[in-house]
């Protein structure tokens, strides 16, 4: 689960990390009161969307007069931002965050992620903040330092010193960054966050360190333990199909293609998307119905796929625990219930796949069956292209 920048800063502030004073604004009626609360000569207007790259897309405006701030807010609210992390359609700005301007002496980068390879939380630090860390890692890898934290011992002072060792930082700077890293680690543990990123972490001329921008993601499987964080969920920022899919236990990710996919298993779903691209088309979604899909689940999956106005659908099922004849009956029932007016290619393999294929072939419905994945992908791509 993602949250907005202003929400992430509220959490970080609760754990002792300094953040600029700010006020969230939902409408133009709130602007005057919000500006008065900030009481700063420089006001930064920030679009609040669940995507990075806002600055380059005009989603972060530094205002030095009240009129500039009001104009920026007016232009930003209700607008659509397209960044490298949004879809081609962009995301609508429904709220903006007004924040006091800060005296920036130096920008740093610091984050914490769940490192699944090592089974630990990793703290990442760089003296090159304010830019994409991927660019820094690619161009100057020596400027990015990663420290893995053993969960048995937790964060220790030497972890912070290791982060800063080659950065030519003073003892005081190292002490302050170590303190921030420890607080980030504690926040990760106590909130079940999967990622915390502060970029940039700024140092002011007076030597203070402030989180100028913040991003937090949370583990969906642990969010039930944090109802106060679940309340921060902004459904307006999420894709409607993904919300609907989650209600039925389906894993769905919307993409920009035109061929809908229904698959059981994440690995098989990725392979299915790859082979669709191999034959010259683009998948419209990632949809994993899981290992225990029922007729109702299959029906809901079709409804979700069709709501995206796809030009064709590829169903790729490997029957292990789930029998192919049950899936076939589910597909038939779903088509009879909701109707499908786009080409449908089905590939079944595994337990009872012969029976499943026979059921589909004898259904007298407009279903094209395939013997293997390559044939299935080739068929659906070529049918859609005609």
From Swiss-Prot:
It catalyses: succinate + ATP + CoA = succinyl-CoA + ADP + phosphate; GTP + succinate + CoA = succinyl-CoA + GDP + phosphate. Its cofactor is Mg(2+). It is an enzyme of class 6 (ligase). GO terms for molecular function: ATP binding; magnesium ion binding; succinate-CoA ligase (ADP-forming) activity; succinate-CoA ligase (GDP-forming) activity. ATP binds at residues 46, 53-55, 99, 102, 107. Gene3D superfamilies: ATP-grasp fold, A domain (3.30.1490.20), ATP-grasp fold, B domain (3.30.470.20), Succinyl-CoA synthetase domains (3.40.50.261). Belongs to the succinate/malate CoA ligase beta subunit family. This is Succinate--CoA ligase [ADP-forming] subunit beta. It comes from Ehrlichia ruminantium (strain Welgevonden).
């Amino acid at each position: 689960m993602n949250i907005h920048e202003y929400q992430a800063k509220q959490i970080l502030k609760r754990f002792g990390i300094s953040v600029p004073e700010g006020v969230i604004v939902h409408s133009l009626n709130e602007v005057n009161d919000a500006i008065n609360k900030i009481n700063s000569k420089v006001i930064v207007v920030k679009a609040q969307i669940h995507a990075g790259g806002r600055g380059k897309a005009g989603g972060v405006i530094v205002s030095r007069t009240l009129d500039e701030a009001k104009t920026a807010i007016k232009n930003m609210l209700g607008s659509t931002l397209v960044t490298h992390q949004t879809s081609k359609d962009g995301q609508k700005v429904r709220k903006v965050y007004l924040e006091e301007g800060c005296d920036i002496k130096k920008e740093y980068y610091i984050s914490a992620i769940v490192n699944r390879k090592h089974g630990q939380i990793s703290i990442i630090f760089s003296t090159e903040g304010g830019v994409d860390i991927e660019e820094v890692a690619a161009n100057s890898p020596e400027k990015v330092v990663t420290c893995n934290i053993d969960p048995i011992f937790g964060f220790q002072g030497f972890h912070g010193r290791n982060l800063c060792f080659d950065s030519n930082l003073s003892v005081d700077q190292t002490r302050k960054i170590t303190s921030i890293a420890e607080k980030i680690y504690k926040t990760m543990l106590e909130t079940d966050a999967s990622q915390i990123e502060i970029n940039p972490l700024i140092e002011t001329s007076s030597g203070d360190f402030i989180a100028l921008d913040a991003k937090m993601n949370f583990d969906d499987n642990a969010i039930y333990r944090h109802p106060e964080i679940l309340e921060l969920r902004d459904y307006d920022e999420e894709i409607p199909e993904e919300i609907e899919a989650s209600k039925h236990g389906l894993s769905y990710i919307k993409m920009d293609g035109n061929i809908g996919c229904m698959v059981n298993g994440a690995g098989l779903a990725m392979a299915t998307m790859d082979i669709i691209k191999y034959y010259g088309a683009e998948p419209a979604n990632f949809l994993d119905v899981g290992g225990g899909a029922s007729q109702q689940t299959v029906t809901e999956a079709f409804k979700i796929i069709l709501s995206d106005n796809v030009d064709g659908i590829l169903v790729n099922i490997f029957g292990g625990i789930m029998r192919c004849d049950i899936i076939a009956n589910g597909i038939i029932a779903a088509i009879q219930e909701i109707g499908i007016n786009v080409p449908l290619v089905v590939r079944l393999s595994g337990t009872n796949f012969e029976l499943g294929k026979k059921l589909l072939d004898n259904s007298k419905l407009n279903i094209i069956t395939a013997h293997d994945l390559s044939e299935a992908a080739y068929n659906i791509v070529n049918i859609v292209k005609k």
